[in-house]
């Protein structure tokens, strides 16, 4: 059984990860070069956006793949993937703005999707276990 939805969002997230990394590299190449944030506030913000993406994305993608494999609703998984992806884009742009509205929306969107997927995964596992016991 191909995990079509998970594969689509894994690919999309890989591209987003490359874009987030590129935003950091572009500043280094056009600036003094080197490692770390170089004392440049925009670079520091972009590095945090990239690192934050890398911190959350594996959990979301693993949960999506497992839920899809377990027969979870394709429509709900698509919705979760879209919300997560858009939340991460908002977070990436919002983190370098003086007013953190987009960053906050992105963070809340990320947490909401991760929490929903985690609860859904636990419920699915317990529900399936109860069916096996009966």
Annotate each predicted stretch with a short phrase.
Residues 1-4, 42, 46-52, 72-75, ...:
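Juxtamembrane loop-transmembrane helix junctions in multi-pass integral membrane proteins
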Residues 90-116:
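Interfacial loop-to-transmembrane junctions
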Residues 63-86:
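Short alpha-helical packing/oligomerization segments
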Residues 9-12, 47-50, 80-83, 106-109, ...:
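Physicochemical signature of membrane-embedded alpha-helices that form the seven-helix bundle of GPCRs
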Residues 52-64, 114:
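Core segments of transmembrane alpha-helices
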Residues 22-48:
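Cytosolic, membrane-interface loops and tails of multi-pass inner-membrane proteins
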Residues 2-19:
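Alpha-helical transmembrane segments
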Residues 119-134:
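Juxtamembrane boundary at the C-terminal end of a transmembrane helix
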